[in-house]
Amino acid sequence: MFNLGDLIIGKPDNGYSYTCGGTICKVVKKWGENYIGVICVKSDNPFIQRTECSLPEDEKMVFEVWSSRFEFFKSGKKNNKTWI
């Protein structure tokens, strides 16, 4: 899982489209069971075109954190979370 302050590039998996898809995002907060808060920017400069959005954790998504690729997913009920 990524941490606060990480810059991520969101990429939809299996055609699922979400707010931050294809933009560079900075993780700014986490809350609840279902959402992670991020800042999405349209350029490498974090002061340009900032917007806030949220990513649903219960959809499988692929992120690229600079050169490292990883997937995460949430499966089953609230007490049965699996992260890869």
Locations of regions flagged by a protein language model:
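Intrinsically disordered, low-complexity, charged/polar segments
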Residues: 42-84
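Basic/aromatic-rich interaction segments and small domains that mediate binding to polyanionic partners
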Residues: 12-57
